[in-house]
Amino acid sequence: MREHSHGANYVSSVHWAAVLDSISELIDQCQEKEKEKKPVPEDGSIAPQIPGPRLLYEPVKETKAEILASMPARTVVDRMVARYFNALGIAPAILHSAQFLREYESFWKDPDATPFVWIGLLFSVICLAVQFQQPGEEAAEWSSLMRIRQFHDRIVQCLVLGQYTRGGPYVVETMVNYCASELCITKDTDVGPWLPLGIMVPLAVSRGYHRDPAGFPNISPFAGEMRRRVATPPNHATSSTPTSTRTPPTYHPHGPRPKSPLSSTPSPRTESTKSAAPSRDLAADAHDRPYPEILALDKDLQTIETSLPPIFRWQPLSQSFMVPGQVLMFRLWLRLAVLRLVIWLHRKYLAPAYSAAPYAYSRAACARAALEIAEFQLLLHEETRPGGQLHQMRWMQSSLMQSTFLLGMSVACYWMQLTRTALPGADQDMEMRERIRDRLRDTYPLWLRCSAVSRDAREAAERLRQLPDLQGLLPDVEGQLSAQESPGSGVPACWDIFHGTGRHARALDAVLGDMDRSRKTNADWARV
């Protein structure tokens, strides 16, 4: 449990915040600084411009005529639809382009006859397309953010007026797009943007998406394939929720599909019947597992990664010039997922209680994974900037990816503190210590850049400032940054929803330019 101004929050043992709390040297210092901070407002937001989930808070007073009147001109919507299907890569997995185009034409012929939910689906397509536009294509970034909020309102209004809780065609598809939009906007690992998933999953189950359509002869092969594609995002999202929200998983792959009865006899089971507990996710398992089992799982993980199709295996960018940015981002996602699982498997054996030689492999595995995560964070920052190989794919960054970077940073800090104090003389790979120290130093400007719009980034920057290994190595940019900003500009006047690029970030770029150039020169990018 972690104490905050709003009370206590629960974090699972594999969450980055739990790892940070294990660093004894930083706990007292950060607690003192937490007391000195001003109380957080009731809504808990840093930037008041960042809304909560509109589906949970938005009252609906508009009529269908008012909603349709707010629809952009068809020429504009045509461009947004084209961008959605051509740029996302993920969107066509839940919407069939030819089928959507037919319904799209029918909408423009008679908008009043179109169901509310389909209108909401169209607004969700427009909303995501606006989020993924390139800076400079349209008006200022701030006006883009305002339009996104307006489209969020329309999506919610259409869902409510269409009585989405009763299910129906395109309800789940609209919810998938809506949740994706919310998660792309959020900067922190707050629970709020994930709450709509708690609505989406039961809706998907009520529509039978948790069952394979092959067993239902009345569902055509085409409809069955589309149902499988629509069912994938809710399943993946619910498995990702614990990573981003600090909570144990509440949805397991064993739950949706019922198993066969244990007995074919008509006698019912009673309260006295004893049966084995269902299997549990290892990350949420409260019981100790034998160390040989952990090593076996680690080997299985390596085997699975090796068995991936070549197109999805991570290769250095120097060997990937001809690979589309979307594929590169998928490769990066998969590699980060593997590194996160490595930490989940071995994080427990970083503790001083496991200082014996047999556990050295786990300590080294965590250190290597944390170092590689930090290198990926730096790589992603460089390549999503204008001119980078991943600039067109920068929209694919989200709070889920940031939580992986936070986990890597936390484990790296813990490993540095552990090998310096709790395990003196053990694991003293000085080259590894220097590499991790340098990467933590290099990522500090990135956390500081996002600290104006992200509580998690602000905490990460604060923890790095307090890390003994980095004392005297971090540039003093706070005073220079405040000198370049006008009074009262703690919240940037405009910020890129993907990078947080407003006055705060531009001033930080000016202050840290030399440091960035030095990092580009010294970093071993060939390894990444």
Swiss-Prot record:
Which compartments does it reside in?
Nucleus
PANTHER family for the chain? UNCHARACTERIZED TRANSCRIPTIONAL REGULATORY PROTEIN, ZN(II)2CYS6 TRANSCRIPTION FACTOR (EUROFUNG)
An example GO CC term for this entry is:
nucleus
Q: Has the keyword DNA-binding been applied to this entry? A: yes
Extract one GO molecular function annotation from the record.
DNA binding
Bias category Low complexity: which stretches? 238-249
Which intervals carry biased composition (Polar residues)?
261-276
Q: Which organism is it from?
A: Chaetomium globosum (strain ATCC 6205 / CBS 148.51 / DSM 1962 / NBRC 6347 / NRRL 1970) (Soil fungus)
Keywords noted in UniProt: DNA-binding, Metal-binding, Nucleus, Transcription, Transcription regulation, Zinc
Q: What does this protein do?
A: Transcription factor that regulates the expression of the gene cluster that mediates the biosynthesis of the tetramic acid Sch210972, a potential anti-HIV fungal natural product that contains a decalin core.
Protein name in UniProt:
Transcription factor cghF
What's the main place this protein lives? nucleus
Spans annotated as Disordered: 232-283
